[in-house]
């Protein structure tokens, strides 16, 4: 099990990203628009830099929904390899069968 504080910190980051996504996209569009004057683009760059670091999507860590484990998490199921193996062996994941040859 991951520390509750680590899981909560990641959840807080997800909320911040969701709240600031529109503003970030608007500022990035201004920065990328070469037809705008350089001063306006520079001002947008400064506003983007002033935003909280945790409002950036790259700060979010994929964590297991079951255990909170940060490593070896499959995006499709949002579960770690350990949780998938555990649930699969109990027959709780439809279509998942243990491989043998």
UniProtKB/Swiss-Prot annotation:
The keyword Isomerase does not apply. Part of the 30S ribosomal subunit. Contacts proteins S3 and S10. Residues 1-22 are annotated as: Disordered. One of its GO terms (molecular function) is structural constituent of ribosome. InterPro entries: Ribosomal_uS14, Ribosomal_uS14_bac/plastid. GO terms for biological process: translation. Belongs to the universal ribosomal protein uS14 family. It comes from the Bacteria. Pfam families: Ribosomal_S14. Residues 1-11 have a biased composition (Basic and acidic residues). Coiled coil: none annotated. Residues 12-22 have a biased composition (Basic residues). Keywords: Ribonucleoprotein, Ribosomal protein, RNA-binding, rRNA-binding. Binds 16S rRNA, required for the assembly of 30S particles and may also be responsible for determining the conformation of the 16S rRNA at the A site. This is Small ribosomal subunit protein uS14. GO terms for cellular component: cytoplasm; small ribosomal subunit. It comes from Afipia carboxidovorans (strain ATCC 49405 / DSM 1227 / KCTC 32145 / OM5) (Oligotropha carboxidovorans).
């Amino acid at each position: 099990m991951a520390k509750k504080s680590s899981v909560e910190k990641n959840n807080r980051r997800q909320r911040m990203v969701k709240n600031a996504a529109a503003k970030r996209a608007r500022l990035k569009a201004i920065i990328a628009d070469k037809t705008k004057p350089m001063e306006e683009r520079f001002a947008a760059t400064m506003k983007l830099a002033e935003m909280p670091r945790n409002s950036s999507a790259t700060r979010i860590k994929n964590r297991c929904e079951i255990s909170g484990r940060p490593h070896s998490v499959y995006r499709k199921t949002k579960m770690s390899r350990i949780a998938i193996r555990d649930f699969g062996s109990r027959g709780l994941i439809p279509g998942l069968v243990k491989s043998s040859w």
